[in-house]
């Protein structure tokens, strides 16, 4: 089996799998609805990418792997089935992709990309497959001739149960993506327990409401007791967080916020199974962050523009706390958040929590909901966010942002939140 075709290859997670299999020696092709930065990069790397989907794209393929967004009526999926070509969902393909690796898997509702990327910096001999772009490598995949592989495991479709972890980290088990679990929290928690039980080494945030009751042997982080003297500073506009962990001394990591110290601590405790503490302390300094996580796009004395993937109230609240600290340290007098809600179901289920998450900032701008394929839900957002400015669009013009109504945002700390298209709106074309 040599020719593998990915339907939906432009996705951040599926593109990492395609890159990994290409490095393993398979001939990779793919397709997507529209061209993107990821599809352009894949083409430069030698992957044949077809835009848009067309039934002829799967001719002469041995295997088709499709993303979670692909429906049965997709022309490529339908034609592959008609021709008898084996078709696997991303979830079903994981055992094939990870089969010969010792997998260090990171799961959790929040913080898994950051934790897995920090772990990748510490275990620098390991291959890496994550759902974010590692800034020090410029990719969501690193291939090494190694048995070890750092993998960001996804609970949203229970695919983390197919990752066969040697080491499992769970950052938290907050209820997200409940639709996949029949809207039953107990089923989600059972899946997390099954994921942990599979691993030989387990590292957990033991102050999480569910994880604190996990009975099997594990390395437990109690953040309120184990993380001390957490301080933040800015060096040439770059954010850094320092903290002490248990009796292991002080650590310094790129990025800002207590939540970053928590994620780094989980990665450190996992890495201690394989490395000495001084090696960990040194390698942690190599970490340069990931794209779309407190990602500083522009900074001077009057303006800092930040892009963040946060799309759940818990994430937004934690990141805004870090943003307030950055603004204080940098002398920025005003904080503006630009929010592109992601999925109607998530917004409807967490309206009060979203309103509370944004209540501490000076100015809130709300873009239309990024539906991600969902049917619209009628919501009175103006009643929930009475002080917000609602705009149809926003775009980057030089250093500044300009809204569709003509408002210009040009000073203070400006931070965009969302998992949809907002990142493209905040960036220059070449970023």
From Swiss-Prot:
Q: What EC numbers are recorded for this enzyme? A: 6.3.2.8
**First-level EC class:** ligase
Which protein, by its recorded name, is this? UDP-N-acetylmuramate--L-alanine ligase
**According to its UniProt record, where is this protein mainly located?**
cytoplasm
Keyword Transferase in record: no
Family recorded in the similarity comment = Belongs to the MurCDEF family.
Q: Which GO terms describe its cellular component?
A: cytoplasm
This protein's encoding gene? murC
Biological process GO annotation list? Answer: cell division; cell wall organization; peptidoglycan biosynthetic process; regulation of cell shape
**KW tRNA processing (keyword) present:** no
Q: What domain of life?
A: Bacteria
* Residues reported to bind ATP: 108-114
Q: Name the keywords, alphabetized.
A: ATP-binding, Cell cycle, Cell division, Cell shape, Cell wall biogenesis/degradation, Cytoplasm, Ligase, Nucleotide-binding, Peptidoglycan synthesis
Q: Name the pathway it acts in.
A: Cell wall biogenesis; peptidoglycan biosynthesis
What does this chain do?
A: Cell wall formation.
From which lineage does this chain's organism come? Bacteria, Pseudomonadati, Campylobacterota, Epsilonproteobacteria, Campylobacterales
Q: Where in the cell is it found?
A: Cytoplasm
Under catalytic activity, the entry for this protein gives: UDP-N-acetyl-alpha-D-muramate + L-alanine + ATP = UDP-N-acetyl-alpha-D-muramoyl-L-alanine + ADP + phosphate + H(+)
InterPro entries hit by this protein = Mur-like_cat_sf, Mur_ligase_C, Mur_ligase_C_dom_sf, Mur_ligase_cen, Mur_ligase_N, MurCDEF_pg_biosynth, UDP-N-AcMur_Ala_ligase_MurC
The molecular function terms in GO held by this entry are:
ATP binding; UDP-N-acetylmuramate-L-alanine ligase activity
């Amino acid at each position: 089996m040599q020719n593998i075709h990915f339907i939906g290859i432009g996705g951040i997670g599926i593109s990492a799998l395609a890159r990994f299999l290409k490095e393993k020696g398979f001939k990779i092709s793919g397709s997507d609805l529209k061209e993107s930065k990821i599809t352009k990069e894949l083409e430069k790397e030698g992957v044949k990418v077809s835009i848009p989907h067309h039934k002829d794209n799967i001719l002469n393929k041995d295997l088709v792997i499709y993303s979670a967004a692909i429906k049965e009526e997709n022309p490529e999926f339908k034609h592959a089935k008609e021709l008898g070509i084996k078709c696997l969902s991303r979830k079903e393909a994981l055992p094939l992709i990870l089969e010969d690796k010792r997998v260090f898997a990171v799961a959790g509702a929040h913080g898994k990309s950051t934790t897995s990327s920090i772990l990748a910096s510490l275990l620098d001999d390991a291959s890496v497959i994550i759902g974010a772009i590692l800034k020090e490598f410029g990719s969501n995949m690193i291939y090494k001739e190694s048995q070890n592989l750092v993998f960001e495991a996804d609970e949203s479709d229970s695919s983390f149960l197919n990752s066969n972890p040697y080491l499992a980290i769970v950052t938290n088990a907050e209820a997200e993506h409940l639709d996949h679990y029949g809207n039953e929290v107990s089923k989600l928690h059972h899946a997390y327990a099954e994921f942990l039980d599979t691993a030989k080494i387990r590292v957990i945030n033991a102050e999480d409401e569910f994880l604190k009751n996990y009975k099997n042997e594990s390395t437990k982080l109690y953040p309120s007791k184990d993380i001390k003297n957490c301080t933040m500073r800015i060096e040439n506009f770059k954010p850094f967080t320092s903290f002490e962990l248990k009796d292991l001394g002080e650590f310094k990591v790129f990025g800002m916020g207590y939540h970053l110290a928590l994620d780094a601590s989980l990665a450190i405790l996992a890495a201690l199974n394989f490395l000495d503490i001084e090696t960990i302390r040194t390698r942690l300094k190599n970490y340069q962050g990931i794209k779309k996580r407190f990602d500083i796009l522009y900074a001077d004395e009057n303006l800092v523009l930040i892009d963040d993937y946060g799309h759940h109230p818990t994430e937004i609240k934690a990141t805004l706390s870090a943003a307030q600290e950055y603004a204080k340290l940098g002398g920025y007098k005003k904080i503006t958040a630009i929010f592109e809600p992601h999925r109607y179901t998530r917004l409807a289920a967490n309206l009060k929590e979203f309103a509370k998450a944004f209540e501490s900032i000076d100015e809130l701008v709300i873009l239309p909901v990024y539906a991600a394929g969902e049917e619209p839900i009628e919501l009175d957002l103006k009643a929930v966010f009475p002080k917000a400015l609602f705009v149809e669009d926003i775009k980057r013009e030089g250093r500044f942002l300009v809204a569709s109504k003509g408002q210009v945002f040009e000073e203070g700390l400006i931070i965009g939140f969302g998992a949809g298209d907002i990142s493209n709106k905040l960036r220059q074309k070449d970023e």
